[in-house]
């Protein structure tokens, strides 16, 4: 049985850290206000040279190093980002060049905070179909450059960073690999979370706009459905899950999903307190941390899930 195996994980965070206390000197907010509503204590903010390409390439190099693989052994680069360096060429192509990969193909996909789950789903389908044998899936985001820093309802929520995984065709030995992926969208809700502007629309501010209450309401219900779908598709129960690695948007949503699955708090990987919401980068950033510190190990069953603008949402089950 062919199975898409996760061989390496890597991540990159900008050097600069901005705490809630620092934000409180610029806007009408406080550390207590932010923590109570989001669970966020700090976020990493990119310097001028820390672009989506720069951070994504560094995360990719680290994923390759973790897997003991070279760039030219990779067939595809799939980048999930809402904050590309330019309209085109794709950030994926720029990363392909930056890591010294001279073969294969590269492209971006846009699914906002669900982008990494979408990327894993696309890569898994291509590997299973024989279109490629390996793929780097990268989430890289520079949200600090699209925020309205005078809007305390959004600017406190996001941070910058990148994460990457190397996926490769495997045999399914020990049931390892991507077991299933489940992705969805509903464009009727596109107006509750979006960037107001795009290339060629210079009269618009290109700032992130969000109806937080509506996003929260949909997140809880739609993520619950995606999680149930993943378990039912594989005749699994909540007790089979070793780790939940959710999109790191809000501590309340994360805690709600963990409780719904009946997981102990220590089975849920949480980085939102230190990274804030890094959109498509949040899941691979959290995966890398949990792999490096020894929590996620060979044989563990990991559930990832995310919801983002679109609305888009999805889940995936991966046996490490």
UniProtKB/Swiss-Prot annotation:
Alphabetized InterPro entries for the sequence: ACP_syn_III_C (IPR013747), ACP_syn_III_N (IPR013751), FabH (IPR004655), Thiolase-like (IPR016039)
Coiled coil: none
Compartments it resides in: Cytoplasm
Keyword Acyltransferase: yes
GO process annotations (BP): fatty acid biosynthetic process; secondary metabolite biosynthetic process
GO cellular component terms, semicolon-separated: cytoplasm
GO terms assigned for molecular function: 3-oxoacyl-[acyl-carrier-protein] synthase activity; beta-ketoacyl-acyl-carrier-protein synthase III activity
Region (ACP-binding) residue spans: 248-252
Assigned keywords, A-Z: Acyltransferase, Cytoplasm, Fatty acid biosynthesis, Fatty acid metabolism, Lipid biosynthesis, Lipid metabolism, Multifunctional enzyme, Transferase
E.C. number: 2.3.1.180
Known pathway: Lipid metabolism; fatty acid biosynthesis
Active site: 113, 247, 277
Keyword Cytoplasm: yes
Reactions this protein catalyses: malonyl-[ACP] + acetyl-CoA + H(+) = 3-oxobutanoyl-[ACP] + CO2 + CoA
Family: Belongs to the thiolase-like superfamily. FabH family.
Domains: entry comment: The last Arg residue of the ACP-binding site is essential for the weak association between ACP/AcpP and FabH.
Record text on subunit structure and interactions: Homodimer.
Official protein name in the record: Beta-ketoacyl-[acyl-carrier-protein] synthase III
Organism encoding this protein: Acidiphilium cryptum (strain JF-5)
The encoding gene: fabH
């Amino acid at each position: 049985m062919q199975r898409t195996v996760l061989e390496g994980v890597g991540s990159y965070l900008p050097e600069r850290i901005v705490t809630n206390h620092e934000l409180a000197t610029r806007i009408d907010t406080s550390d207590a206000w932010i923590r109570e509503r989001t669970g966020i204590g700090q976020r990493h903010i990119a310097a001028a040279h820390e672009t989506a390409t720069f951070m994504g390439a560094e995360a990719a190099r680290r994923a390759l190093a973790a897997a003991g693989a070279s760039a030219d052994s990779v067939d595809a680069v799939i980048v999930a980002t809402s904050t590309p360096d330019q309209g085109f060429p794709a950030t994926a192509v720029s990363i392909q060049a930056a890591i010294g990969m001279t073969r294969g193909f590269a492209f971006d996909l846009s699914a906002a905070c669900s982008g990494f789950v979408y990327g894993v789903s696309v890569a898994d389908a291509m590997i299973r179909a024989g279109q490629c044998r390996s793929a780097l899936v990268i989430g890289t985001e520079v949200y600090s450059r699209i925020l309205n820093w005078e809007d305390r309802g959004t600017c406190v929520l996001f941070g910058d960073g990148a994460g990457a995984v190397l996926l490769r065709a495997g045999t399914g030995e020990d049931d390892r690999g991507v077991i299933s992926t489940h992705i969805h969208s509903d464009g009727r809700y596109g107006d509750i979370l979006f960037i107001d502007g795009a290339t060629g629309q210079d009269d618009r501010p290109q700032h992130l706009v969000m109806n937080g209450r509506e996003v929260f309401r949909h997140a809880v219900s739609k993520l619950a459905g995606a999680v149930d779908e993943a378990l039912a598709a594989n005749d699994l129960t909540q007790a089979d899950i070793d780790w939940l690695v959710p999109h790191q948007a809000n501590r309340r949503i994360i805690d709600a999903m963990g409780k719904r699955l009946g997981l102990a708090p220590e089975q849920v990987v949480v980085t939102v307190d230190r990274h804030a919401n890094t959109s498509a980068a949040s899941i691979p950033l959290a995966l890398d941390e949990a792999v490096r510190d020894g929590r996620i190990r060979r044989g563990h069953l990991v559930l990832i899930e995310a919801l983002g603008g679109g609305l888009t949402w999805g889940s995936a089950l991966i046996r490490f």
